[in-house]
Amino acid sequence: MNIFVSCSSSDKISDEYKVVTRFLMESISKDNDLVFGCANRGLMGICYNEFLKNNRKITGVCYEMYKSDLEGLKLDEVHMVKYIKKYLMIMTLIHCVKCLIQH
């Protein structure tokens, strides 16, 4: 099952959020695949690394203006989008949205 994660990619975030995110992702990433916004920092980076550690399928959906964020990421699939409408459409139509984590 795909898990869509939408969360902060900022490194300037309370450690409390990092601990909770890691705890949740350690469990969720064992039996699910990740769909996320292509950042390897902040809470999004924690999510990415937990799924990577468990050898799960990782799909990124990235705005064209942030394509440099793809550097160094190990992704099984990437969808580049120009507008938020297409971003949301991909998330809802192509992938089974099961879990939403926001900060």
What are these regions (language model features)?
Residues M1-R56:
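Glycine-rich beta-alpha loop segments
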Residues G42-H103:
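Acidic/glycine-enriched connector segments
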